[in-house]
Amino acid sequence: VAATGAQSLAAGLGVADEGGNAIDAALAAAFVALATEPGLVSFGGGAFINIWPAESEPVVIDGNVEMPGRGLPHDRFGAGVREIWTDYGGGVLMHAGHGTAATPGCVPALARAHADYAKLSWPRLLEPAIFAARDGYPMGAAGARYLNFVADSLFGDDPEAHRLVTRGDGSLIEPGEVTANPLLADTLIALANE
């Protein structure tokens, strides 16, 4: 199992030890990464999933985001977009705000991979992510580094979002510091029960 952090790895290994297949392990690890790496990956984003079944050709599940209103004249979109410059990665210009929101494709792609290739139940694969979001997880070094650049500029306009990526006093979460997202846990419980 390849994973981005200890909790993701444990989730993947745990379902593999229970008899899950490679897709089960990858999905469990991905769910935990999505729940514990704020800013780096998101359930609200896109995903491309590459699967090569043993007895057939490789498959790519396209879970890219869709832009609502694509094809409409530019003047139909209105305002709500702000430009944010960050020094992260050598310098990146981002666009943020409600005018930049896309329809997420990540969860539908994960659901398709589960329906077509997984062995264990959907709720079982979400359990480790629910636990991590509800009970806490150590902030990874990569996530803390990214949030150091964007916690205020990207998340600062929305007090609720800002609280999710900083401490209660607004200061930055350090690598290894335990944080949680109970509202995400509630959402994942609902997703598990769908």
Which residues fall in each region the model found?
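Noncatalytic scaffold domains of N-terminal-nucleophile
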Residues: 1-10, 14, 22-194
